[in-house]
UniProtKB/Swiss-Prot annotation:
Protein name: Elongation factor 4
Domain named tr-type G: residues: 5-187
Family affiliation: Belongs to the TRAFAC class translation factor GTPase superfamily. Classic translation factor GTPase family. LepA subfamily.
GO molecular function (one): GTP binding
GO cellular component, one term: plasma membrane
EC number(s) from the headed UniProt entry: 3.6.5.n1
CDD domains in the record: EF4_II, EF4_III, LepA, lepA_C
Membrane topology: Peripheral membrane protein
Lineage start: Bacteria, Pseudomonadati, Pseudomonadota, Alphaproteobacteria, Rickettsiales
Gene Ontology BP term (one): positive regulation of translation
Catalytic reactions of this protein: GTP + H2O = GDP + phosphate + H(+)
Amino acid sequence: MQQQSNIRNFAIIAHIDHGKSTLADRLIEYCNALEAREMCQQVLDSMDIEKERGITIKAQTVRLVYKADDGCVYHLNLMDTPGHVDFAYEVSRSLAACESSLLVVDASQGVEAQTLANLYQAVDNNHKILIVLNKIDLPAANPQQVQQQIEDVIGIDASDALMISAKIGLGIKDVLQAIVTKLPSPNGDSQSQLKALLIDSWYDSYLGVVILVRVVDGKIEKGMRIRMCSNNAVYTVENVGFFSPKKQISGVLYTGEIGFVTAAIKQVADCRVGDTITDDKKPCAQILPGFKPNLPVVFCGLYPSDASQFNHLKDSLQKLRLNDASFEFEQESSGALGFGFRCGFLGLLHLEIIQERLEREFDLDMITTAPSVMYKVYLNTGKVIDVHNPADLPEMQKIKSMSEPWVEATIFIPDQYLGAILGLCTEKRGVQVDLTYVNGRAKLVYLLPLNEIVFDFYDKLKSYSKGYASFDWQIDSYKQSDLIKLSILVNGNPVDALSTIVHRSKAEFRGRELCKRLKDLIPAHLFQIAIQAAIGSRIIARETIRALRKDVLAKCYGGDITRKRKLLEKQKAGKKRMRNIGNVEIPQSAFIAALKITNKD
């Protein structure tokens, strides 16, 4: 049993690409947690997609054993967290399990938007912050300026910040020494009843559900009967252990320790993240506060390209949800695309990752509809409904008003790109809240509609700033807006998969662009096809695909003009009848390309 005073629990937080996972690699290497032949880049990033993109998606935990200069042996529980805003829920779970944080800042880039967002979360959790300036070996590194920037922007003392280069291993011992001397040991009563925080859960095909826990009071050991406080489910503990980063069975976890527990739990849904785990016979008097679950903010439809793959898609989504409880899905059907699922995500990167995992791990070919957000619709009857699928929107005459979610966005940009970014925010209906300057960089705070962000805001932001802008957002509130449903009609029939909810000021432009795009994508038929964009019953844009013409006079070699006229009249009547009863085949490529309209508008 390790003395409680010799345990340190800490998370590594930083902006994307500032070197969190590389620092974790060096700490693991220095503590000899893995043999040299087992070391590789981003050891804790286990998914192929994480290694390929160079990002962390799932927060990972590892226990390191470090012998300090004072001769004592310390157990360091390290949690590597994601940097992207979409995976902020992973960060919040890790921070709730720790007492302190290493704030890693790139010495060449300085404070970025995610640096601030993650730091504020750590401060909310009453963490002791240890500042680490990484990449000091780069020619562009300016540690003194970044120290000043940290003090100016964040307001915390950076005079004793640690100078390191995680890539070449410079200053790693200083980091470990600072962890054991400056960071606090965990609080908690080892003699009290068991009280543990459920940090994460995932599914293992052999062990069932594996749960990651932080023991706050008491201890958890093999054979113990434990109870989940949220649903009073009782389980018998089968295995207890920790990651080093390999799985190690210890049989018991004491106060202040972080590790995994298996107890023949069948479904991840039974293990609510943030739940309190206690002893079934001697339950704790008060449960832990936990943390609020993240609600999905971006929604889209996923449909199999081949209708016969529907059940395979359903099974794949259920399997993915076992390891990622943050995304939701429900069955829906579309007249144009058949049966599929309406899915909710934490952001566009989250959507992209789930889509890529479905295609790669489950070999699925899918159609993704345009992303949308959750709107609040106030009906004339006084009832309020939530709508994220345009097909579910009631008729406009039944609606009193509509509200859309707005976000508070923080943007860091070099001075020379400020004008272009201010123009972009205004174009996206933004409202400026704050503008400050720190060391040649501008910090912008804007209120923006989430509907404008989920399409192409991030791409344009990077394009206008030549890649130098950093961006973070959080939901602010719902605000009333002049929103309408834009319907696309092909030959007078609405195509539900192409309907969108847009602001009235952008409806005409969006409608015209969609009609033009569809005209190029839908193949010509033997009859004329009208493509129309409509708001309610009012047509705002139209394009016409001309009919293919069969030469019915080819077999007439001379003869009376009435013979030719008779054949032409017959063709004309046939086309008229075909226009009334003929179905327009819209290829799937047309849906996919038309839904990308927003990337270029």
